[in-house]
Amino acid sequence: MKAELIAVGTEILTGQIVNTNAQFLSEKMAELGIDVYFQTAVGDNEERLLSVITTASQRSDLVILCGGLGPTKDDLTKQTLAKYLRKDLVYDEQACQKLDDFFAKRKPSSRTPNNERQAQVIEGSIPLPNKTGLAVGGFITVDGISYVVLPGPPSELKSMVNEELVPLLSKQYSTLYSKVLRFFGVGESQLVTVLSDFIENQTDPTIAPYAKTGEVTLRLSTKTENQALADKKLGQLEAQLLSRKTLEGQPLADVFYGYGEDNSLARETFELLVKYDKTITAAESLTAGLFQSTLASFPGASQVFNGGFVAYSMEEKAKMLGLPLEELKSHGVVSAYTAEGMAEQARLLTGADIGVSLTGVAGPDMLEEQPAGTVFIGLATQTKVESIKVLISGQSRLDVRYIATLHAFNMVRKTLLKLENLL
């Protein structure tokens, strides 16, 4: 099946917003075994949108339109598609009730007539309820071509796709079962090299590598009758892949950290902290709180994290963490001594079970004769204090800080897994 994505909105063409919906939808379609062959962006113009829909209908089996479902005159996606299909717009009862409930809590004057447009669907379509907004989506098949209309705001679109569209498409078309393996500590080129025979000779299941900032994923996919058979086939392939070794002789199982498209090193670490009822603190220099803000983004973070430190300058490291200023000057802020001292002092000052620290050179200039991308990460527990040195070369300042944070989470994760093995 060939699918096409159409993003509707002049703000996309003018660069005011980034079309993140296209990436999300492409990934979701891939999970369902639906190939996205084309992506188009078009402004809020009926004539041009009609032209784009016409072209898409001639070359694609599934046409997904995003955006333009709001209350204003330039929100014309449903109206234009209805015109193309020669269908009327009708009101969806559930969407109308949601409008009633929403405006019942507001001043009567706030419900202007144009808001009613958000409750309209194309006649004969299956409504797609909007759990986080007011504009209802829809699914309709005409002359063998299926059309989907979705809201533009990502929070609304993602909810509608996950809860409404994916289950609907799964029933309509044969399902592709997938498993995503996540790796940290090996590059895409090396991973593809050590798995080249699997990738070059793949039939079913298939293997698709994807490089992300600082990590790599492998999507294993199979088309089969049910989940149980898929789990068996994908599990066998996974075991074969993880038995391979990197070019340095390290088992791939050692750089594999988890499953899932939406998973992360931070999430894996957070869940282990919760599992073992451990608390953590951090003292950050070059990452300036990125580790702590990432950890705090998870619901329930207060179970494991009470606070930490951001000490950017040498003087603040001495003042906030109680590290000897003369020793800091002697060893330098970009050093194992400073990283270990920051981690241990943070742990002692907060009473946490684990202290982690990040100090280094974000770039682009050198610091203390150390090149950009040099990072020291410290980790302290009740029984030991240690540090690692990481060189993150060829990256922007932003990516150096982000990848350093990944290394810190991975270091904590490995420490917690050692605890798991002792139980």
From Swiss-Prot:
Lineage: superkingdom: Bacteria
Name used for this protein in its record: Putative competence-damage inducible protein
NCBIfam families cross-referenced by the UniProt entry: cinA_nterm, molyb_syn, PncC_domain, PRK00549.1
InterPro entries per the UniProt record, alphabetical: CinA, CinA-like_C, CinA_C, CinA_KH, Competence-induced_CinA, MoaB/Mog-like_dom_sf, MoaB/Mog_dom
Record Pfam families: CinA (PF02464), CinA_KH (PF18146), MoCF_biosynth (PF00994)
Protein family (similarity comment): Belongs to the CinA family.
